């Protein structure tokens, strides 16, 4: 259903198997540092791991790491990755957090930095961003009580993935849920969404779907059976 658009970066990445940070931290790094590159204050971009650090009694250490995220140098990347490890303490709960201390080596740093550069080039073509790190206030239910999205442009709801693979059914269902929750939320910005999109800076590829092409039966099932909105 999605239209596939390869982008133009000819500079290849090192193999994913060479990276010294796990995929979840790589994804968070590209997400948060792309926001920083586009003008979001570092403290705002990293507010989730900062909260997680406070929840596990590491707030002072996290602040020291944040103070070292000043640019896109290797030293800043190391500090950012250490700080991002606290993200899980906020999202999953402090009881599930275990320190990992993942530090990027040269190959990993190159990949992370290149993926941020690809993300900036992507937004030069598909942007500008009108909202990042958005929530679905008013759209949550007893079944889905939390969640936030990546980026919203004028008419497209975007999800960033740094997987080595193409979007799978779980990813597409998640994006559909985000769109439907957005329409049930208090935020008018979602009323302008006409397309759902994935951008994968590792593959440097875009996938786009007009929401008018989504089967109405799938939309109804998502609304009522998955998210839990009442039927009229």
Model-derived segments and spans:
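Metal-dependent nuclease catalytic cores that hydrolyze phosphodiester bonds in DNA/RNA
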Residues: 1-144
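Conserved catalytic cores of phosphodiester-cleaving nucleases, focusing on short active-site segments
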Residues: 149-164
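An acidic intrinsically disordered interaction segment
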Residues: 133-152, 212-215, 219-230
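Accessory, usually C-terminal, subdomains that scaffold auxiliary metal cofactors
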Residues: 161-232
